């Protein structure tokens, strides 16, 4: 199994030129040969086909591949001024041109919708994307999102599997996010077994799980790397054994925010805002995410799965 790394965390490094060659080059220096490519609205302007061709060339030059991508997050049921269908059609075409075989497209939600309404609307939404997926032959991945306190109902493996089964199309499969699942107190092994042959991709990251709501922050989608704290509670033995038992074919893809911008309030001293330590340096970022690669290699090696 190959290790992969989502490319979006470099967006948080100040004054770093965010072109594909720079961003993917840094990820490659950390050891990764695969990336989960983050498609933004800026990618999907009138030049999106040229951008996709450039990405494909950069990946080839670096000896990398992008087995999966993430489309812009737009709520199809409350899109504002955005043409969500145009965004998703372009995202699928972008992937085809760039050589990316599958892309995460999030479900939508409306405040106070019931589970029945949520499923009815989202099954119809995903089915409306079938022609756009079939034309380039790119898979759409449904990701687990939400918790008991919000309007999403893709909390558990059974929920996401039900959604994929209701859409009922071979190009519509599942990306399991370990951190999101951990916030909902999921048995990870049982979850992976439930997802079974529909599980085609991962977002691997950690957090401290669920606390009772009396805590100020009882769920925090932290996106930390494994072993970052003694309280991190994703069980990677359960994850990897589940992947083995279902014959998982995808990458072990990290979606971590390790050594990134702090969201703490600004510090003011003598009337001036001080930001000297708000961001890490690029060198610190590289060292930290080289460690992420090494951790992933250690995990996969322990099960005889690592593929360089």
List PLM regions with ranges.
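Histidine-acidic metal/acid-base catalytic patches
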Residues: 1-9, 17-31, 99, 157-176, ...
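Active-site acidic/histidine proton-transfer and metal-coordination neighborhood
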Residues: 58-61, 77-174, 265-266, 279, ...
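Active-site-proximal loop/turn and secondary-structure-junction residues that shape catalytic pockets
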Residues: 9-11, 39-41, 72-75, 107-111, ...
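Conserved beta-strand positions in the central sheet of alpha/beta enzyme cores
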Residues: 36, 68, 104, 141, ...
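Glycine-rich, proline-tolerant flexible connector loops at the mouths of alpha/beta enzymes
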Residues: 36-59, 109-113
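Residue-level detector of anion-binding/catalytic polar loops
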Residues: 33-34, 65, 101, 139, ...
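Active-site mouth loops of central-metabolism enzymes
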Residues: 2-19, 74-85, 112-118
């Amino acid at each position: 199994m190959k290790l992969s790394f989502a490319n979006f965390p470099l967006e948080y490094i100040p004054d770093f030129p965010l072109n594909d060659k720079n961003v993917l080059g840094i990820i490659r220096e950390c050891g990764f040969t695969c990336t989960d490519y983050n498609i933004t609205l800026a990618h999907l302007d009138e030049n999106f086909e040229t951008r996709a061709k450039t990405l494909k060339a950069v990946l080839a030059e670096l000896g990398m591949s992008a087995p999966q991508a993430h489309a812009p997050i737009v709520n199809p049921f409350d899109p504002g001024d955005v043409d969500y269908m145009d965004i998703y059609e372009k995202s699928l075409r972008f992937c085809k041109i760039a050589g990316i075989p599958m892309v995460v497209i999030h479900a939508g939600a409306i405040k106070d919708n019931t589970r029945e309404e949520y499923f009815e609307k989202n099954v119809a939404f995903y089915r409306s994307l079938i022609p756009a997926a079939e034309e380039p032959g790119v898979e759409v991945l449904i990701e687990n999102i939400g918790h008991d306190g919000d309007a999403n109902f893709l909390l558990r493996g059974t929920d996401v599997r039900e959604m994929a089964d209701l859409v009922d199309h071979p190009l519509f499969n599942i990306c399991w996010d370990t951190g999101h699942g951990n916030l909902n107190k999921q048995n990870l092994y049982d979850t992976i077994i439930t997802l079974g042959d529909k599980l085609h991709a991962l977002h691997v990251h950690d957090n401290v799980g669920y606390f009772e709501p009396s805590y100020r922050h009882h769920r925090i989608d932290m996106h930390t790397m494994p072993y970052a704290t003694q309280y991190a509670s994703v069980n990677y033995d359960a994850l990897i054994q589940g992947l083995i038992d279902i014959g998982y074919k995808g990458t072990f893809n990290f979606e971590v925010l390790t050594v990134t911008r702090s969201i703490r309030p600004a510090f003011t001293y003598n009337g001036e805002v001080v930001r000297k330590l708000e961001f890490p340096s690029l060198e610190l970022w590289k060292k930290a995410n080289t460690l992420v690669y090494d951790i992933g290699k250690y995990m996969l090696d322990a099960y005889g799965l690592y593929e360089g």
